[in-house]
Structures are given as C-alpha cells and as structure tokens.
Amino acid sequence: MSDTKKLMLFEKQAEVAQALAHPLRIAIIDFLKGGSQCVCDIAEHIGSERSNVSRHLSVMVNAGLLEYHKKGLKVIYKLKCPCILDFFACISGVLREQAKQNNRLLKVLE
C-alpha cells in the first residue's frame, strides 16, 4: 500500500476514533450491544436528554458505527459493525494493564 493510501486510511480511522471519543457515545454503544433501541429508550437508559442523545447518535451514524430505521414515529438504532465491541474489550485490557502497573508502583512507593 502506498504512503498516500496509508495516510488516507489513517485519516479515516482517526475519524471513527473521534466518533468514539465521548463517554456518552461509549455508553450508547454499550447499551446497543443488547440489540436495537429507539432514541427514547437510549436517552432514558443513559440519563440524558433526547436532543443530546440524537446529536451523539448522528455523529456515530456519520462515522459508520450505527445504522437506523424508522418504525412508525420512532427511530430505531443498532450497531452497524458489532466488531466495535472487540475494540472496547481491547481498551479494557489496556486499562487492566495500567491498573497492574499502577498497583506495582504504589507497592514500590510504600
């Protein structure tokens, strides 16, 4: 792959990563791992206003993380690529390693 193509790929990957870079968006993805949900249920579950949730959902749809369909008056969202959950499992692994390192550091400092 040429350097130009690699750079384009990295830019697109950064766009997806930016769409994940908010705690409410991560909470939404975590909730949607249980299946499709309407905006009203997502907002209630994460404890945020529907307008705020809709804005975050829009960012994630534009990044290709979520898809939606209308069911009557409701808009139903679901994970477009459930493999994103593997990414969060990896992040949890990184956090566990950090915690181990911090625990070792605390023991050294005691």
What residues fall within each predicted segment?
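Residue-level detector of secondary-structure transition/capping positions
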Residues: S36-Q37, V61, S92
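Beta-hairpin "wing" of winged helix-turn-helix
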Residues: V61-K71, K78
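N-terminal helix-turn-helix DNA-binding core of bacterial DNA-binding proteins
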Residues: E11-S51, K74-I84
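Short, hydrophobic-biased segments on the C-terminal half of alpha helices
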Residues: L57-S58
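Amphipathic alpha-helical dimerization/coiled-coil segments
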Residues: M1-M8, K12, I84-E110
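Noncatalytic linker/hinge segments flanking ATPase motor cores
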Residues: L32, K70-L73, L106-E110
